[in-house]
């Protein structure tokens, strides 16, 4: 059964504004999450007279997936962790741009999960019209410091 989200989006994502691109979680259960955003001129990637290009919706979908695992973490009294978008399959956009003022719904359905890796079928809706669809593969390591250290990168806290 889906329930309203008890947390603001800032609590669910390991991001900071202005890179938090979705506004809120509308609905979730163990199999899916639905988020919402309104396209605004002050958003990153907004182009005057055009809006936001459809390919930016990949980040909206990735953030919805991140909100899903962030919400899971908080409900289990765990820390929200950083994750990575590993790949995108079957990206299809029916429109090239999203205009200022449009309110969009982002849905991510869990397809597969095995430890630190998950696959989600995602879609962006304007009203009832599906405008973009893609399948995202994501990875959320248990120890981000070890992963980065293996690449010679130190994460500052």
Q: What is the meaning of each model-derived region?
A:
Residues 67, 99-105, 109-157:
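HotDog/MaoC-like acyl-thioester-processing domains
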